[in-house]
């Protein structure tokens, strides 16, 4: 399976200033075999399913990433990242269990 990542560069800059996490860093959580992806029913709409993934980045930080999944073909999934931040204590506990 191949992952293709995309994001809005302006949102990436705002997110980096606000949360100290770039979307490039956030994309690395999808390499974590222990990452946990949950459907975000509260923010999904009919036209777009949204997801939240909790995982370890390649820099060692535990991150929460808000994104979409879009299957481009049988081999490729497009992931559009629109928010990311460092995990807080309850999320760290959830990841550890």
Can you say where each PLM-predicted feature lies in the sequence?
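Ribonuclease/tRNase effector modules and their secretory precursors
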Residues: 1-97
């Amino acid at each position: 399976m191949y992952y293709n990542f995309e994001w809005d560069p302006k949102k990436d800059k705002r997110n980096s200033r606000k949360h100290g996490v770039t979307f490039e860093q956030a994309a690395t959580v999808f390499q974590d075999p222990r990452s946990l992806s949950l459907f975000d029913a509260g923010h999904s709409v009919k036209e777009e399913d949204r997801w939240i993934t909790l995982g370890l980045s390649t820099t060692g930080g535990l991150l929460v990433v808000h994104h979409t999944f879009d299957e481009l073909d049988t081999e490729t999934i497009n992931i559009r990242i629109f928010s990311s931040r460092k995990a807080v204590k309850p999320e760290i506990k959830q990841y550890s269990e």
